[in-house]
From Swiss-Prot:
Protein name as it appears in the record: UV-stimulated scaffold protein A
Source lineage: Eukaryota, Metazoa, Chordata, Craniata, Vertebrata
GO CC, alphabetical: chromosome; nucleus; site of DNA damage
Positions annotated as zinc finger (UVSSA-type): 574-601
VHS-like as annotated region, ranges: 2-145
Organism: Rattus norvegicus
InterPro entries per record: ENTH_VHS, UVSSA, UVSSA_C, UVSSA_N_a-solenoid_rpt
Superkingdom as given in the UniProt entry: Eukaryota
């Protein structure tokens, strides 16, 4: 009975489900009703499960406790006697021992425990004094708010307040840094915006009044939308309040002031609404401007108009404003693009970051407004550039790129003085003096040049390499001459079978050039690779024991080893193993000669059977040997069925063909060892990996060794 009770409690608490199994819970209640000893035993088992470091186990155990608490007086007496420990395990009232993970299950456990304790106090508080005292302790000492949805204790609220203060401090420091950055970069941003606006004025020289820098793009877009023809009449061109009419005999030259004023009248004629002059404008200047163009004939003459008898219709394109890139505005466009690139890549992200920092901190409202204004100005500059619709010239870009490429090519060349006595072309009658062959006729050269050019270059390169005594080709030629001369000069009789076999093996053996490793072959004590130290005769800095010879391990290793570069051609493996696996699939490994699981790779059909009869017979023999080694009664599946029927362990796990993977004890519970896939966890996995730590330790040791070697003779550093 005790074994059955412990098994039921273990299964119920380790199920990992939010609700208990009703059938098993019914069996547990039945066992607890049988005797008080079983009830006490169940209480001890439940308290043991409540001490587990897993919130899901504690939650299931608490649900069982709640069921038994409402039904048994004996269980209530046992629980109230250990009520403080129960509160620490279910509510986490002890600050030093909070509830274990997972966090969601711990939160549900705390909420369920608070509701249960409050209900127990209302129902059984008068009969059980310790229960009422525990409720009073939670409410008044631990400051637990039973109406709080999150059911937080005083310690938890303090922790959250400290966490919030820490976040506020971080946001405040970030806002302070943003304030300093803003004070440093505001002037630079203003200069960049001014440069962009000046470039825009040079590209689109519209004059629409005193506020043209703020409205010329908006006015131009408004004109493009209302592309109706506007009639121009001399009445519109006549200044208001002039009161003068009739021709004027004197011809006055057109000056810059006339052009500016005329531009104002032309803008009003085509429908551009220029804003009214400011109230603070000087009235004397206004009177002078009206008096200068009081005569309509002078106005017509300055604009190239003949008479008042015709009208002008001005049609604006509907596709908006366009700027054509040419040689005149190329420098301005380059300057504007550089400034806009600086705005887009540096200033605008920085300003957006300032706005976010000031918003999170909730302070520096003036700086926040200034940052928002800067952001709007930067975005407006980018929008203006998009509205320009700059069309690159046809040949402008190609000419610019060609000019830059030519400048780079000129910079790559280095001026070298001409060699004295150098003749770029040798005459035909002097070729014999230089040891050159006479030139072939032109027809012969034209005939054979295309065929023999590659072969001739290859042959000349080989001859040049062979002529150099320090090259590998010259060494190979010398070795070939040495090997061929004794074989050609010596005349031997017929060779015996052993000598013939040795000669055949020598012929098949690869030729290895002579090296340092062959020079010291078989020598145990090498004379080379030793460092000889000269004996010093000074009596002060001479050590007591002097090693006259020091062996260098690196040099000794070089004398015994040789690095040979593979000069062959890599051929990828095309075939597969295709052996039949236990799951019915074919092995897809692409080893060259031997599969590590199925042995030598042989040709097989689509079912994994060998195509060669010899291989098929060999595999059948191997299968028979395996069957003899493992009888049929040792089949893992058969043994598992017998174990399930009899309840006796026959050792089926020992004969199982599966790997020795560690089986989880409670697979339904959340694995606490599996960490959340967060950025911090991934960084910790990489930074604190065993290999990374070893590399860091090796680098630090190397730094210390270098420092020691550099300052070992100085007592000031040697003592540190």
């Amino acid at each position: 009975m005790d074994q059955k009770l412990s098994q039921l409690i273990e299964e119920l608490t380790t199920s990992g489900e939010s609700q208990l199994n009703a059938q098993k819970m019914k069996e547990l209640k039945k066992i607890c009703k049988s005797s008080e000893e079983q009830l006490s035993h169940a209480y001890r088992l439940l308290m043991t499960q409540l001490t587990q470091d897993h919130a899901e186990i504690r939650l299931s155990a608490f649900q069982i406790v709640d069921e038994l608490f409402t039904r048994s007086h004996q269980f209530r007496v046992l629980l109230v006697s250990d009520f403080q420990e129960f509160l620490e395990l279910t509510l986490g009232t002890d600050n030093d021992h909070p509830l274990p993970p997972p966090r969601e299950a711990a939160q549900r456990l705390r909420q369920a425990a608070m509701q249960a304790v409050e209900g127990w106090n209302e129902k059984f508080g008068e009969a059980y004094k310790k229960l009422a005292l525990g409720y009073h302790f939670l409410k008044h000492t631990k400051k637990v708010d039973f109406r709080d949805i999150n059911v937080r204790t005083l310690a938890e609220r303090k922790r959250e307040e400290e966490k919030q203060k820490h976040l506020d401090k971080i946001h405040r420091e970030s806002a302070d840094r943003a304030k300093r950055e803003m004070e440093e970069m505001s002037d630079e941003i203003g200069c960049c915006l001014t440069e962009v606006e000046n470039c825009f004025r040079l590209l689109v020289p519209l004059d629409l009044g005193p506020y043209r820098e703020d409205k010329f793009f908006g006015e131009a877009s408004g004109i493009a939308e209302d592309h109706a023809p506007c009639a121009w009449s001399p009445d519109l061109a006549t200044p208001r309040g002039s009161g003068l009419s009739g021709p004027q005999d004197e011809e006055q030259p057109c000056c810059s002031k006339d052009l500016v004023a005329s531009a104002h009248h032309a803008g009003s004629a085509v429908g551009l609404k220029a804003p009214a002059p400011a109230a603070t404008e000087d009235p004397c200047r206004d009177e002078d401007r009206h008096s200068e163009h009081s005569d309509p004939e002078d106005f017509l003459r300055s604009h190239g108009l003949g008479s008042h008898k015709y009208t002008l219709d001005v049609e604006l394109p509907s596709d908006g404003l366009k700027v054509q890139e040419n040689e005149d505005n190329l420098a301005v466009l380059h300057a504007a693009r550089d400034s806009l690139k600086l705005i887009q890549n540096k200033f605008l992200p920085a300003v957006c970051s300032w706005v976010q920092r000031f918003t999170r901190a909730g302070i520096y409202s003036g700086h926040l407004k200034q940052a928002i204004d800067l952001k709007m100005e930067l975005e407006l500059a980018l929008k203006k550039y998009e509205e320009l619709n700059i069309e690159p010239g046809r040949g402008q870009r190609s000419r610019t790129e060609a000019l830059e490429d030519s400048e780079e090519e000129d910079q790559d060349f280095v001026e070298v003085p001409e060699k004295e006595g150098y003749e770029p072309r040798i005459p035909d009658h002097l070729r014999a003096e230089y040891g050159l062959e006479p030139k072939a006729p032109l027809k012969t050269l034209e005939k054979h040049t295309a065929v023999c050019s590659v072969q001739e270059r290859t042959r000349r390169r080989r001859e040049e390499e062979a002529s150099d005594p320090t090259s590998a080709a010259a060494q190979m030629l010398r070795l070939q001459d040495c090997l061929s001369s004794p074989s050609s000069s010596s005349t031997r009789g017929p060779l015996g079978p052993e000598e013939a076999q040795k000669q055949a093996e020598r012929a098949r053996a690869p030729m290895v050039p002579f090296g340092v490793d062959l020079c010291y072959w078989g020598q145990e004590q090498l004379t080379a690779g030793k460092i000889l130290k000269s004996d010093s005769q000074h009596r002060f800095w001479k050590p007591h024991e002097v090693e006259e010879e020091v062996d260098s391990a690196h040099v000794s290793e070089m004398l015994h080893s040789r690095h040979i570069t593979f000069s062959g051609k890599f051929e990828p493996v095309q075939h597969k193993c295709r052996a039949l696996r236990p799951n019915g699939r074919l092995c897809e490994r692409q080893d060259r000669l031997k599969c590590p699981f199925h042995g030598k790779i042989i040709p097989r059909d689509d079912k994994g059977q060998p195509l060669n009869p010899e291989d098929r017979a060999r595999e059948q023999r191997q299968q028979l040997q395996q069957q003899r080694a493992h009888p049929d009664w040792q089949d893992p599946e058969f043994m598992k069925d017998v174990e399930a029927a009899t309840g006796v362990d026959l050792g089926s796990s020992k004969y199982s063909k599966k790997g020795k993977g560690k089986k989880k004890k409670h697979p339904n519970l959340t694995d606490l060892r599996e960490r959340a896939n967060t950025a911090r966890a991934r960084l910790e996995k990489k930074v604190f990996a065993k290999g990374a730590v070893q590399r860091v330790v090796a680098a630090m040791n190397q730094m210390d060794q270098k420092k020691h070697e550099k300052f070992a003779n100085q007592f000031n550093y040697a003592l540190k």
